[in-house]
Curated annotation (Swiss-Prot):
Its cofactor is Mg(2+). It comes from Desulfurococcus amylolyticus (strain DSM 18924 / JCM 16383 / VKM B-2413 / 1221n) (Desulfurococcus kamchatkensis). RNA polymerase that catalyzes the synthesis of short RNA molecules used as primers for DNA polymerase during DNA replication. Also part of the exosome, which is a complex involved in RNA degradation. Acts as a poly(A)-binding protein that enhances the interaction between heteromeric, adenine-rich transcripts and the exosome. Mg(2+) 1 binds at E172, D215. Pfam families: Toprim (PF01751). The gene is dnaG. It catalyses: ssDNA + n NTP = ssDNA/pppN(pN)n-1 hybrid + (n-1) diphosphate. Binds two Mg(2+) per subunit. PROSITE patterns: TOPRIM. This is DNA primase DnaG. GO terms for molecular function: DNA-directed RNA polymerase activity; metal ion binding; poly(A) binding.
């Protein structure tokens, strides 16, 4: 069943046949909006139905009605109607086409159902008569776009099918969820505008295939980096450059999701383009995907230069001794002045809250972990000194890592 029916009137200054009119419509609209919106292509794909023409001749003039069933959406159907109005010739004769009406066939069908419902109810009699208003309300509710649900302890905006879907789409905010729901995507969940990736997203990502769908601007880049540092992602999809997910049409959403890129392919392309952080993100994603780790060793030349040029103040040894057994950390400036002394339990959060390159070195009474290294690399800390070294899978040549024993 078609969604809409375009009704148009045609007037021609001459006597023509129906097939002449249909041929003129196909011929004069061909190629105006490219092959994708060609009437023959639309018919082949079932997007529009068979064009019907009813004519009558009076003297030397022909008038008639054109009927075109459409399965396109509202905007595309209106565009199609405007397109056929551009036909101004049928054979050698001048012609004009004007749109009389665009009928929503679904609403017409619902109207007939409602009329028939009332008729049936009247026949049943008053004692069997249900509340017609409730019936109408139920039908209206059925036709409404689903509202986002609140998911997880963080009450993240989401579609109704997140739990039962094998694959989910992760977007930025509530407006993105609403837009995707409008076009039938129900396996979506938003980050909720949180500064950090919610635990609910991390847990879902461990259990399901995930596509991260972000805006096509700098904001989308920042969100992508934050998510890739914290949650397992299988595919990346992006809105067109400069566009936001919440404003995309059904077709634009479909095209963006069709063009989604496998996460490691995407990050490897970023590495080739000179994105320094992409190599770190590859290691993080490999760990989140539970793949064998690729230990990246710094080039020997660079490592040698770091060793040769590293200069530590004498007072640092005294600071290290004062840290033994305290479970505390000290932040240093580039001049080796103490900037801050904090409990080790707050170390990662304090690093993440700092500005890049504000911290030159960190010394702490604790274990150097991969999570800690990821945090200091992001903030471009130069030296990290801890009590012991844990399991390390990746570090950059720019970061010097030492233990208390090496400096004792």
């Amino acid at each position: 069943m078609a969604k809409y029916l375009i009704r148009a009137r045609i007037e021609i200054d001459g006597v023509v046949e129906k097939h002449d009119i249909i041929g003129a419509i196909f011929g004069q609209t061909e190629g105006l909006f490219g092959n994708e919106f060609d009437l023959r292509v639309l018919q082949d794909k079932g997007r529009i139905g068979r064009i019907q023409v009813n004519t009558k001749t009076q003297g030397s003039k022909t008038t008639g009605e054109i009927l075109i069933p459409s399965n396109l959406d509202r905007v595309e159907t209106a565009l199609l109607a405007a397109l056929i109005e551009t036909v101004d010739k049928v054979g050698p004769y001048d012609a004009s086409i004007s749109i009389v009406d665009i009928v929503d066939l679904r609403m017409e069908k619902i109207k007939k159902i409602m009329e028939r419902t009332v008729e049936i109810l009247r026949r049943w009699g008053k004692e069997k008569t249900p509340d017609v208003k409730e019936l109408i309300k139920s039908i209206q509710e059925y036709l409404k776009v689903p509202e986002p649900v609140s998911y997880g302890p963080e009450e993240l905006p989401a579609g109704p099918d997140v739990d039962k879907a094998e694959e989910i789409i992760i977007v930025e905010g509530r407006a993105d969820v609403i837009n995707l729901l409008r076009y039938g995507y129900t396996n979506i969940i938003a980050l909720g505008g949180a500064r950090r990736v919610p635990d609910t997203i991390k847990k879902l990502a461990e259990l399901k295939k995930t596509t991260l769908f972000v805006d096509g601007d700098h904001g989308g880049d920042l969100i992508m980096k934050e998510v890739l540092r914290n949650a397992k992602i299988d595919y990346i999809a992006r809105a067109p450059p400069g566009r936001e997910v919440e404003e995309l049409s059904s077709r634009e959403i479909e095209e963006a999701l069709k063009k989604k890129i496998e996460i490691f392919q995407y990050l490897e392309e970023q590495v080739k383009q000179g994105n320094k952080e992409a190599q770190l993100l590859i290691q993080i994603q490999r760990r989140l995907h539970k793949l064998p780790e690729e230990v990246v060793k710094p080039p020997e030349k660079v490592a040698k230069e770091i060793t040769e040029t590293l200069s530590l103040p004498v007072k640092l040894i005294e600071d290290i001794k004062s840290l033994y057994g305290t479970l505390e950390a000290i932040f240093y400036s580039s001049q080796w002045d103490q900037v801050k002394r904090i409990p080790v339990r707050d170390l990662v959060s304090e690093i993440q809250a700092s500005e890049p390159e504000k911290i030159h070195a960190i010394v702490f009474d604790g274990i150097i972990t991969q999570r800690l290294i990821d945090a200091v690399v992001e903030k471009r800390v130069k030296i990290l000194i801890g009590a012991r070294l844990g399991k390390i899978t990746f570090k950059t040549p720019e970061l010097t890592i030492l233990t208390f024993n090496e400096l004792a």
